[in-house]
């Protein structure tokens, strides 16, 4: 049978989609594109905000309307959090944010019998890391490797600890073996991902540090680039940077969670750092990885955020000089403390502050990309786009160049100009 996937949300979801693709492929099924006619469609959902939930529902409704006779299966954080919504949306197979093998089994059972299936667990009771096959479709150049799941930070705006459960870490030996398998299959880059990879190891014997895992993987696959998923400021220390700076195949791009550049807002968010500690992390990364790309997320118009607090955030992001940012207006999430906070801000304020923050972010992004002009970057090429081949440099800047079939090749490119959402250059002989 033929199936197609639609993935919303984080890189962990991308990994889990790749794992489910692999489970289907090993059983003799095929994985098609979303727009193709298939026997079943799997939607891997995100529930990080109420806006994400709205997008989930829109994708499910559109899929059901366009494919009235196909099996529609939904998994991920949205179905984990709101399983009661699935029946009204016409979903045939309902899974949560774990038990992917069982979910695939239910999908195949429904495809054969047309009997609806549902299986959910209590996320807060999870204690074991779910081992899944690493991989997916062979035409990809970059593979996700989940090394951790769960979160216990309980930030005031976030529901993910309730949908993903407590921290569970992949044993180091398992992660290394999966990384080797991905390298042997031809992937040129491996992204270490999880819900909060900074917590990797806290539940393992001896509580090993994340650096032990990253170092072991970098040594095991020297032919692959290794990229880190989102990090927390607390983990960026001098020892962390010194140890990882020794690996040439570690990509110098660090997504450092921020959310706000104002200490009083960070306190209301229940984040576990202040701007001084955050900037210390930025300075350490710049010191040990010269020219690295530091990227982040920012929530604007959090409940009670005053104009002065917002201006503090803008000044702070300018100080940090981020290479790229994701800007989100605060979205109320029922069931979280922030949803009950006073002084909820209106859409007009959210929109104006989003525009202001995006303008600063775009200015910084352009400055970072302009600084690359004249440099030579090792680019992993992925696909053709508008007459160019596009790929990513180690710092994750998108690079466009003209050339013949370059898929999954790493080539030296001299950067000549800023172009679209990245830079362009010429491939060196």
What are the residue ranges of the model-derived segments?
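Proteins enriched for Cys/Gly/acidic motifs involved in redox and nucleic-acid/cofactor modification
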Residues: 1-200, 215, 239, 244, ...
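Residues at or immediately flanking beta-strands
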Residues: 2, 71, 189, 225-227, ...
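Short, solvent-exposed loop/turn segments at secondary-structure boundaries
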Residues: 52-54, 166-171, 201-207, 268-271, ...
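Conserved strand-turn element in the central/C-terminal portion of the radical SAM core barrel
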Residues: 154, 158-165, 226-234, 260-270, ...
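Conserved, mostly hydrophobic/aromatic
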Residues: 175, 192, 228, 256, ...
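Acidic, glycine-rich loop-and-beta core segments that form the ion-binding/anion-interacting portion
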Residues: 209-261, 272-279
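Contiguous mid-protein beta-loop-alpha structural module that forms a pocket-lining wall or clamp
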Residues: 305, 321-322
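Terminal RNA-binding accessory module
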Residues: 340-429
């Amino acid at each position: 049978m033929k199936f197609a996937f639609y993935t919303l949300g984080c890189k962990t979801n991308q990994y889990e989609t790749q794992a489910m693709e692999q489970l289907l492929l090993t059983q003799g099924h095929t994985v098609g594109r979303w727009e193709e006619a298939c026997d079943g469609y799997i939607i891997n959902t995100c529930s990080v905000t109420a806006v994400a939930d709205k997008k989930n529902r829109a994708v499910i409704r559109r899929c059901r309307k366009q494919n009235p006779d196909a099996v529609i299966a939904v998994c991920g954080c949205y179905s984990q959090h709101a399983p009661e919504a699935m029946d009204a949306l016409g979903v045939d197979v309902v899974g949560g944010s774990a038990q992917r093998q069982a979910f695939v089994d239910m999908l195949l059972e429904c495809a054969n019998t047309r009997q609806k299936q549902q299986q959910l667990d209590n996320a807060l009771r999870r204690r074991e890391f779910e081992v899944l096959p690493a991989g997916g479709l062979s035409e990809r150049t970059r593979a996700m490797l989940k090394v951790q799941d769960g979160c216990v930070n309980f930030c005031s705006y976030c529901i993910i600890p309730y949908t993903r459960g407590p921290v569970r870490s992949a044993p180091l030996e398992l992660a290394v073996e999966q990384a080797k398998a991905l390298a042997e299959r031809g992937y040129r880059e491996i992204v270490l991902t999880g819900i909060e990879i900074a917590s990797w190891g806290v539940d393992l014997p001896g509580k090993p540090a994340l650096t032990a895992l990253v170092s072991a993987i970098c040594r095991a696959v020297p032919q692959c680039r290794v990229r880190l998923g989102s990090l927390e400021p607390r983990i960026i220390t001098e020892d962390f940077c010194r140890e990882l700076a020794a690996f040439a195949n570690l990509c110098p791009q660090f997504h450092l969670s921020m959310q706000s550049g104002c200490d009083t807002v960070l306190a209301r968010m229940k984040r576990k750092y202040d701007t001084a500690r955050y900037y210390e992390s930025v300075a350490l990364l710049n010191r040990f990885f010269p020219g690295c790309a530091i990227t982040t997320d920012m929530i604007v118009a959090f409940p009670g955020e005053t104009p002065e607090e917002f201006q503090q955030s803008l000044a702070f992001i300018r100080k940090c000089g981020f290479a790229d940012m994701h800007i989100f207006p605060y979205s109320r999430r029922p069931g979280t403390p922030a949803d009950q906070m006073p002084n909820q801000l209106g859409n007009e304020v959210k929109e104006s502050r989003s525009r202001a923050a995006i303008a600063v972010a775009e200015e910084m992004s352009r400055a970072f990309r302009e600084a690359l002009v004249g440099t030579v970057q090792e680019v992993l090429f992925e696909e053709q786009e508008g007459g160019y081949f596009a790929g990513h440099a180690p710092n994750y800047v998108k690079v466009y160049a003209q050339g013949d079939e370059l898929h999954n090749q790493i080539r030296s490119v001299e950067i000549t100009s800023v172009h679209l959402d990245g830079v362009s250059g010429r491939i060196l002989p």
